[in-house]
């Protein structure tokens, strides 16, 4: 899809042209050229229309940029509700499905404060910490995204139907799974990578040593995102997972300021840009000027800069360093860059 803007063009493309695409094996080309089973595709489109759902593909400009930058972003997302540009300022909150009073209180406080600071809260609509985070965010007037481990038409757990509806009206519910997919256990690790991928960082509130929320934290690390954890009672099983993360280097969180400090470079970045005059721009090297112009609209991940500049990665890194040393560009957590 990086070469063909329209999926239909992929199927009508010449065999030899498809072979020129990096990573496309002859067997894959053969499958593409021989594909004629369009009936299931038509059925899926009809389901989308009937359920009034949106399908967002990887090449769509509206595809979430945080998620786009992970190693294996889902090629498409089923969505009910709306994802906005401001949702790139997001923190995921995950944890135990059976939290204690302390876990509930902390989650409510942090989620509400994030919402009041214009941060979107991402979670998985599960029982416990997930649901508490979604509700606290909504109550504070914020936006929240829920990622499902099932088809988007399958609300799980069933008692969250009203919460599902409220989220879709004040954020979005999304899934990479086909309509009708049941919430199988094997789906949830895939869901977790999306939760962390949508976010600048992941906060683990309470988790046992084998909690699925630790998988989300692992994905966050792999995706070069921040990992935060709420410290807990050393004698409680619910604290062992989060305390272990802190021991390994996760940011200890006492209040929302600990999170905002780490992602501060992403907040209000548009108002902090350094605008160069014509003389200063002309004084830049050609590659520096190109990178400056690419970064003129918003912060971008290093992979995006390399792709958009069409320059070798070593050249991009060298020129970014030069711009950074001259105070023109700043680096943010997760290998993002923006105009200072």
Question: Which residues does each PLM region occupy?
Answer:
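Short, small/acidic-rich helices and loops at N termini and domain boundaries
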Residues: 1-61, 229, 302, 328-340
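Glycine-biased, small-residue-rich flexible motifs in mid-sequence functional cores and linkers
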Residues: 49-50, 57-340
């Amino acid at each position: 899809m990086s070469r063909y803007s329209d999926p239909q063009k992929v199927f009508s493309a010449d065999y030899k042209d498809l072979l020129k695409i990096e990573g496309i094996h002859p067997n894959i080309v053969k499958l593409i050229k021989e594909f004629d089973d369009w009936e299931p595709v038509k059925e899926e489109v009809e389901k989308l229309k009937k359920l009034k759902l949106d399908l967002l593909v990887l090449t769509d400009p509206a595809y979430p940029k945080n998620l786009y930058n992970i190693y294996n972003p889902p090629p498409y997302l089923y969505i009910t509700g709306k994802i906005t540009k401001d949702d790139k300022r997001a923190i995921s909150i995950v944890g135990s499905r059976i939290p204690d009073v302390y876990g509930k209180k902390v989650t409510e406080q942090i989620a509400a404060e994030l919402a009041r600071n214009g941060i979107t809260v991402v979670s998985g609509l599960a029982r416990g910490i997930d649901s508490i985070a979604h509700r606290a965010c909504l109550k504070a007037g914020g936006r929240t995204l829920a990622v499902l481990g099932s088809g988007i038409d399958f609300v799980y757990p069933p008692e969250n139907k009203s919460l599902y509806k409220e989220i879709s009206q004040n954020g979005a519910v999304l899934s990479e799974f086909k309509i009708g997919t049941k919430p199988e256990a094997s789906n949830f690790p895939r869901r977790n990578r999306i939760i962390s991928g949508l976010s600048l960082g992941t906060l683990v509130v309470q988790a046992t040593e084998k909690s699925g929320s630790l998988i989300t934290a692992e994905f966050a690390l792999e995706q070069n995102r921040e990992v935060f954890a709420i410290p807990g009672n050393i004698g409680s099983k619910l604290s062992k997972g989060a305390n272990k993360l802190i021991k390994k280097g996760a940011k200890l969180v006492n209040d929302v300021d600990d999170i905002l400090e780490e992602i501060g470079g992403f907040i209000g970045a548009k108002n902090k840009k350094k605008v160069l005059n014509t003389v200063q721009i002309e004084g830049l090297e050609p590659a520096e000027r190109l990178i400056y112009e690419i970064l003129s609209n918003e912060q971008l991940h290093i992979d995006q800069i390399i792709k958009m500049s069409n320059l070798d990665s070593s050249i991009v890194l060298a020129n970014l360093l030069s711009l950074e040393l001259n105070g023109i560009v700043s680096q943010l957590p997760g290998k993002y860059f923006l105009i200072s």
